[in-house]
Amino acid sequence: MTFDFSKVSTPKGKPNDLDWQNPVSFFYKLSHPEIKDLFPVQRDILKNWFDEYKKGANDKMVSLNTGGGKTLIGLMIAESMRRDTSGKVVYVCPNTFLGKQTIDEAKKYGIKTASYLRLNGERPTWVNEPDFLQNNAVCVTTYHAILNPRSIFKNMEIRGVIFDDAHLSLDLLDRNFSLEVKDDAIIKAVSEIFKSSPHIKERIASIQEGDPIPLVMIPPIEWHKQTASIKDILNANEEIKNGLSWMNIKEKLDRTFCFISANKLEIGMLYPDIKNHYVFHESVHRVYLSATLPNLDDITRVFGVAPSRIEIDNPDYRPQRLFVFTKKLQFDDSEKIIRENLKDISQKTFVLTPSNEALTPYKSLGALIPTNSDDVPTKIDSFKKATEGILALANRYDGIDMPGGTCHSLLIDGLPYTGTLKTRFFSEYFHNHRNSFLRSIIASKLIQAFGRTIRANNDYSVIFILGSKLNSWVINMDNKKFFKSDLYEDIEIGIGISETVSSLDELKSLTKEILGQTDAWKVFFEEKKNGLKPVEVLSREEEQKNISLAKIEREINDLFMAANYRECLELILKNQSDLASYSQPIMGLYLSIAAICCLETNDVRVGELSARAYGINPIFGAPVISDKKARSLQAQRIIDFGKALPSFDWSVSGTTFDENLKRLGDILGFNSRRPEKEGDGTLDVCWEDEENN
């Protein structure tokens, strides 16, 4: 039998079509019978991005209203990068659920994808892996699959990354570089080490007694001194020892921060140590997608890059949102009454709560409530097909869409639970830090939630706001900078209307007006929108100032993580005026880091800097008492040099010798580091002068 070579396909090269890489052009050549055209705003964004991309611009942030077709834009950009580079491009989602939705969207648009998702079981599995390996398809995956230290992608030549829902990634990145421990014995053992610490000993005692309220940050200098003992405790636990989070932080444990409550211990970095991560190499093109307006300075601190925005005004985006604030309603027990009469107020309502416990009131109403995560899609599908009823979900603020008249009534019951212990602690103690991560994350979740029942330019929805904390958060004027102007205008209108509602019957009547789309409602809403004064948001000048400071904070973090203590110290001191004017509590934190740098470099300023941190807030720990007298830097270096000479003994281990050689470089005034220890693998020890020679 002769083998038939004619059936072997010929390898495909790049087509000669000049528009083959242009997303606006090739969109019309894809097979998507259900999708007739791009929205004008989508076309403008894709054109803007492609023009910038061809000029070599990187790190672009694309912001688009919920329901505005963000996923299509992301997929088109990913496909454009794949075609242009003939390389591997990954589309990164917060979780598997959203990954599946992205794949379904890609099929509708005629875009071929591969995926690496946890579809069944505990481990992710491949679908269409050969297509991705041969650079013939974009791969849809999750943040965890990309960021974990054993990532299957880290040895691949990744050319492009789409970070979808970038507003959620702030929290996701933080968690990947944090160790969370709920083992009572470990919490007890670690807290025992610090139980005599003057400022926190009472709260440590309360934590050890099981009090759920106290939350403690171990003073950074005290934590730094005790990390060898901490490492022994954690390494004794096999689950922790073999965990991916521990792999991310164990070699830099002395540069982490620890937070303890009665039921949780959390160890993490100030900001994720991703400077040398493979997806942040210069050769990788990155795009960040968001349905909110995240602070770019937050993105800069967490990602270590400063994206520039691609934001196109959409004049056709005119949804009708009626916010009902129970805090403003003029009748008693309004929240209880709304919960008990929800079916009478609105025939069909989608309910979102922060926890499973908060779902309890809706069980008696016969609400569809999933029994587990696998049951979520089934319950959603049943609700979409129904003409009445309630769907109640816990902590599902994004990815659940109610398009095409599926549901026009949304109830959000309670402020979203979010953030790590670190974020919670910073929010409580650094409350005047103007761009608190917690506020930014909460805003992102709420904006996502508000968009669940608004899926088109001219859609409409009533949105009930329940819970004292949630009402206060949304009404608070200080949080308006997190909202786009059109959303904040609707919130202002809702506050005014809610103040006029004095009974359940009036609330029913009001809800009937918007859900029935009466002429009276439409005229009223349009007049109110047109009568509002323009909302002041963060100016570009102020945003750029915040970004500049965020870059400095990120550089401090990177130097600290690299154990480049001397340069880190000098950078903090050089910028202390700007840091202090921005936030005194944050300045206290950086003074604590500066004091640690002094400890590591035998700098006599450790007492002064730790005392200044303590003066800002005792949470940073008692001042370090130094028996050294202040000397000039030159005199200190001469003394340190004399002490260092006996360390150079060829009989010591290679690791010890390298560390001694690094310290000698510090003494002589060089920027000294150990590339091999940092994962570089090129040099054992490197001394650099100010010109990096």
Annotate each predicted stretch with a short phrase:
Residues 100-101, 106-157, 377-383:
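Inter-Walker segment of RecA-like/P-loop motor cores
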Residues 363, 370, 636-676:
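Acidic-basic catalytic patches of nuclease active cores, encompassing PD-(D/E)XK
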Residues 27, 44, 50, 61-65, ...:
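Conserved coupling segment at the C-terminus of the helicase ATP-binding
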Residues 601-653:
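Interdomain/boundary linker segments immediately adjacent to catalytic/signaling cores
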Residues 71-120, 144-145, 292-299, 352-359:
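Conserved Walker A/P-loop ATP-binding site and its immediately adjacent core
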